[in-house]
Amino acid sequence: MSVDNESLYLYNLTIKHPSSCIASIVGQFLGNKKSQEIILANSTSIELWKADSNTGKLEKIYQQASFGIIQGIDKIRLVGTQKDYVVITSDSGKLVVLEFDIEKLQFVPLFQEPHSKNGLRRTSPGEYLCVDPHNRAILIGAIEKNKLVYKVQSNDEGKLELSSPLETFSKHTLTLQICAMDTGFENPMFAAIECDYNARQQDNGEEEDAGEASLLLNYYELDQGLNHVVKHKSNEKIPGSSSHLIPLPDFIGGLLVCSKSTIIYAHPSKDKLYLPIPIRSNTNETLIVNHVIHRLKKNNFFILVQSQLGDCFKITIDHDEVNESIENINITYFDTIPLSQSLNIFKSGFLFANVATNNKLFYQFEKLGDDNNNTTLQSCNFSDYNSIFELDISKRSFKVAGLENLALVDIMETLNPITDGALIETLRPEVPDPFKQLTALSSHSYLKTLTHGISTNTVVSSPLPIKPTAIHTTRIFAESANDEYLVISSTLSSQTLVLSIGEVVEEVNDSQFVTNEPTINVQQVGKSSVVQIYSNGIRHIKHTMRNDTIEKKYTDWYPPAGISIIQASTNNEQVIIGLSNREICYFEIDPHDDQLVEYQERLEMSGGSISALAISSSSISKLQRKSSYAIVGCSDETIQAISLKPHNCLEIVTLQALSANSSSIAMVPHGYSTSVHIGMENGLYVRVTIDEITGKLSDTRIQFLGSKPVQLSVIGLPQLQQNGLLAISSRPWIGYYSKGDFKMTPLLNTNISNGASFYSEDIGGEGIVGIDDNNLIILTISNTDGEESGLNVNDDFIINSVKLRYLPRKMNVDSPGDNEISSSSYIYIIESEYGITSPFPVTVLPDNQKESTNENIDTPEIDQDYYDAFGFERSRHSWASCVEVIDFNNQEIVQTIELPKNESAISLCRLQFESQQTKNQEYLIIGTTQDQKFLPNSYSNNYLYTFTINKSSNKNKSQNEILEFVHKTELDYQPTAIIPFNGRLLVGMSNFLRLYDLGQRQLLRKASSNIEYLKNIIRLTHQGGSRIVVGDSSMSTTFVKYDSTENQFIPFADDIMKRQITALVTLDYDTIIGGDKFGNIFVSRVPETISQQSDKDWSLLRYQESYLNGSGSRLKNICEFYLQDIPTSFTKGSLVMGGKESIIYTGIQGTLGLLLPLSTENEVKFLGDLQLLLRKYFDYNFDDFDKDKNGYNLLGKDHLKFRSYYNPVKNVMDGDLIERFYELSQSMKIRIGTELNRTPREIEKKISEMRHRSAF
């Protein structure tokens, strides 16, 4: 590919996929009859989860990116089989049937049946998807006009087969909902709520009121004999508020039509029945949004429906099987859970709630609500539709209560919707290196902090009598399950302390260890011996079991006089030591009597003193009990591989230079290869692969772990069926293999300075024992709540949440100075929520007088737990809004300022006014609007609130006095964007830019400029000097300069296309990055000549004529990329210490990703060519698919078209696609590598390097 040297090239990586799931389905996708799995589908990926019926926990099995937009998902199964397939509709224009391949651990497409053009259109089938309950047919429908039906059958080989689609269409018809009816052995039938918009128009051309107009309930029958779809028009119309259909089991037939506060039973050949829905007290209506049907034994079943407020109702039906008629339909209040997109019930008695705007929840049924005494309504009391509304509201209202029938057992952390995000870098006293955390306003009323790492749970913390410097663990017998000795060494006091491990940790007095010298290493060798290596020798202790007692007999080995042991490495069969005279001594264990047998020759290292030494541990590799090589680190900044094979023992086979001295080395086999892990004194960690035959070192990977020397030790990870690595620098890390790559992840909640692997059944299995100052620490790797031991490799983040009052909109991070410890980092958050009434008193008075926000106000006691569970009281066209201050380090709210009723906070910024004599006094400005309504948008008043920030006096004051109210200023338009600008406040409102300074009673307007061709300014960013960039809601971005002589803001360059801006950030003086509401990310730059004129020849550029309803010049479009998520924030920074600065973005559906700038022309060409080859490999043409030459394209969507959905992708490499290189077979990797003139290992190294430059 050709490369423009003056352009910018980016590499996109998705760090966290969207968590907003459009649907969830439960089935037996693994083919196991005794277990069920659940599939979650978001717009761009599908996830497979498994529920543990014993613990009630959900475990992710697999996640697969779709590289397309998923519209609908359902399941289908062939008769006589026990495995479910997945049916998906998407923007690829194909109906896709997937099977989960257990061997490959991925979803594999069985069919990709094209039915329409690529893309999303209202006439393209795919918006609706439903499968016949008896798996005989699949219907896909468009929003308007078209529907397709596929017959499902099995071929001669017993495999699933789809027929050609049968089409049916209705002119001028909009489809609102479709469901598949259960007709038993009759022809498959589907029901749809539809609207004939042509008939809705009156003769005079006016339209009926949508709320009063009726809808149609039409039936579509697949005549299997005639192979034709027949449309049955309904004779009676249904209410205009009808929005949900619930099909009933075949022995009853028909369906339930859910409308506003009403349920209607409908059947093509039976009379209708009417049932009112209970209404929550203090509300006016109930709308059913989703349901789940659960069948019990025989013909028993119940329906669980959920309302728009989250209230769940249980519907049961009294059916007369003799007369085949319904006697009664009953509905009663069940429980209240968060509003969900879908509900799923497992056979094991669990309920999964696919919550729409919060964490997904997993419940267990405690009971079925049969003894519920709350409001119960029955259809037998109502003869027609109008009789429902004659019922007194008090007889159908109910009060919500805590969970009675359900018990919460697991929480699946999600981030959607993210409204704002930031990267915060803090310093902590216990860790000298910066600590990076992502914060996001997400999940409806939460501030979520994402920390890269794995949580730990401290089991034991005990002081020690000596100052420890190293710690070791060992068994006594080879067949022992638990570690029995804990050996603590101190070089400061030249002591060794031996502790026994059991129910109580206590000192051992008869261990026969040398205790008056520091221990270098301890190892169980042979069958029943232990080796202690200390500075002046090796003690071999043999244990013999006689008469239930253990006899101990020891022998000693001493180095030559005046020589000491400085390094050692051991396994069950081998011992190798490094002496102070630079000699290497090698021992093997006699298998008959466990004695040490020294190799007659010694090797003198020529590269300086020995700084590190390692051999492979036999406990890791059972196939090869002895290590073939030893790795020696020397003080001349080299490592050398030494053969331990019989024919060339102690012969140097490889030498490799390092950038610093090695401080620790470990060898860990994995699969058919062995990795050499090197910790260095400069804080770098290096991983290389050693060839088992030649001993050559290759495939070097480097990562920065901290500012202190790196110490390594091998630990057991039985839950991953592998051994991992514990690396300790300025903070501890754990290394393990995941998804084909080795990952290093920090350990949180601990600050151990030395550690070792530790196994004990008393702590539930494998753990880590370490030293923290003078304390002995025993910890386990656990989940976030510390309840169970286990390493979750599917999530790189630990999420901590702070509950907020209302829906958060924007935040401003107030970080301390570079030399400060972050004990006073605050986050200021504006929150506002529509359609609710707040119970909290106003703490900012509505007049313009200066009032303290911290006066003692007598407030009634507010049940916060009630509002957290059930939400605030609903009220039309009402707003509640507040400002909250979060102490970031302590993760707590320190101040809340409730704004006046019906005011909504929409913008904020923090600045210092240059006109003020008080130096370093910061102000927080909040922009609000009053009585805002939508469709059409209207408001009554707009204000700017001014607060002082009193951080410096916080130590002597109550924490509630961080913000103090100064005054408020009335505005003409909504202050949708505010930023500091050269010591003043710049406000974007409507199409005006106004400059304000601080006054005594209000803000003083200093300048006002009207940019005529703009519509609504919603984003502002300061480029530096007098230049700003304006982001408009429909007119994209415009570069503007402040002319101080005329006191005006004058535009001089704007975008080449119209965009609906949602996020905007400065990259440099001439360049910006932005996102729009259609999911695009773009980078724009001012042409160099225009930029120079704006600074040097402003008089020429100032009076240029407008061009095509814009400024006289246009920006240059550098990058273009489609995300399929609306960007809400951009932050410049790195997610790892010492990483390269990149652009971190968040998306409203919960997406986290980064855009990494590429450095060299060769890098751009290589990644561009690799991306092109992978596009060809994952070809979207399924008809010509060859599994030896192609990879599976999940949805059959062309990757280039996906990333170019609205505009052609430009100068952005898709790292998500490139990382699929790991999935390729070895032969395909070689073939692609040949075309790129690279080996597969070189390509994998480059892909890994790209990720670790700024991420993990």
Swiss-Prot record:
<dbReference type="Pfam" id="PF03178">
    <property type="entry name" value="CPSF_A"/>
</dbReference>
<dbReference type="InterPro" id="IPR004871">
    <property type="entry name" value="Cleavage/polyA-sp_fac_asu_C"/>
</dbReference>
<dbReference type="GO" id="GO:0006397">
    <property type="term" value="P:mRNA processing"/>
</dbReference>
<keyword id="KW-0747">Spliceosome</keyword>
<keyword id="KW-0507">mRNA processing</keyword>
<dbReference type="Pfam" id="PF23726">
    <property type="entry name" value="Beta-prop_RSE1_2nd"/>
</dbReference>
<comment type="similarity">
    <text>Belongs to the RSE1 family.</text>
</comment>
<dbReference type="GO" id="GO:0005681">
    <property type="term" value="C:spliceosomal complex"/>
</dbReference>
<comment type="subunit">
    <text>Associated with the spliceosome.</text>
</comment>
<dbReference type="InterPro" id="IPR015943">
    <property type="entry name" value="WD40/YVTN_repeat-like_dom_sf"/>
</dbReference>
<dbReference type="GO" id="GO:0008380">
    <property type="term" value="P:RNA splicing"/>
</dbReference>
<dbReference type="InterPro" id="IPR018846">
    <property type="entry name" value="Beta-prop_RSE1/DDB1/CPSF1_1st"/>
</dbReference>
<dbReference type="InterPro" id="IPR050358">
    <property type="entry name" value="RSE1/DDB1/CFT1/CPSF1"/>
</dbReference>
<dbReference type="Pfam" id="PF10433">
    <property type="entry name" value="Beta-prop_RSE1_1st"/>
</dbReference>
<dbReference type="GO" id="GO:0003676">
    <property type="term" value="F:nucleic acid binding"/>
</dbReference>
<protein>
    <recommendedName>
        <fullName>Pre-mRNA-splicing factor RSE1</fullName>
    </recommendedName>
</protein>
<keyword id="KW-0539">Nucleus</keyword>
<comment type="function">
    <text>Involved in pre-mRNA splicing and cell cycle control.</text>
</comment>
<dbReference type="InterPro" id="IPR036322">
    <property type="entry name" value="WD40_repeat_dom_sf"/>
</dbReference>
<keyword id="KW-0508">mRNA splicing</keyword>
